[in-house]
Amino acid sequence: MAADLDPLTPAYEAMGVEGYYLAHGATYRNPHEDGVRGALTMAVATWTLDLSRVLDLACGSGEATLALRELGADRIDGIDPFTGVAYQARVGQSAEALRFEDIAAGALGGRTWSTVVCSFALHLVETSRLPGVCQALAEITDSLLIITPHKRPHIRSGWGWQPPVECKFQRTRARLYRRVGAESNSFGMASL
């Protein structure tokens, strides 16, 4: 049934995730863009998110970047090892070509973002690599917003993050994690 919900599942199964993006990264478009946009809009309306400097992690062709721009973010950096051509063509800026394993190894050390958004990608990280990626992200931001079509990934508090709060737009979930020990550990509610 998962294949019915995600049109990319058969391609991932046939080619592997990396193989798919190596073959199609330059022309990639997330088939769930409306869900990404809706979930981001709902997240910004529901929680107090600092959008002063955002990292769009696994930025694809810019689905989250474009939605975040519409929501008031104007300093957005993109990272994706496969879709840089598609991102550049669509949003007019380059994406840094880093892999999750590069991030786990400290490639982003010394840099900070107010919020990191990872849309439809963190659940694809190998389970053995996920703790290192999460711990590295906890060193560069206080807020991690994961946009996902399901309840994965499962991030443990020992990896640097508090249990999340969640909102849902249609079938797309927005899960906000705050870094353990962050200056503001609250999940402030936006004024409505």
State where each predicted segment sits:
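Class I SAM-dependent methyltransferase Rossmann-like catalytic core
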Residues: 2-49
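Class I SAM-dependent methyltransferase SAM/SAH-binding core
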Residues: 55, 61-105
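A short acidic, Gly/Pro-enriched loop at the edge of an enzyme's catalytic core
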Residues: 106-116
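A short SAM/SAH-binding and catalytic strip from SAM-dependent methyltransferases
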Residues: 114-128
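A short glycine-rich, Lys/Arg-flanked "PGG" loop and its adjoining helix->strand segment in the class I
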Residues: 131-143
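Conserved beta-strand signature within the Rossmann-like core of class I S-adenosyl-L-methionine
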Residues: 141-152
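Conserved Class I S-adenosyl-L-methionine
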Residues: 157-179
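Core SAM-dependent methyltransferase catalytic element
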Residues: 172-192
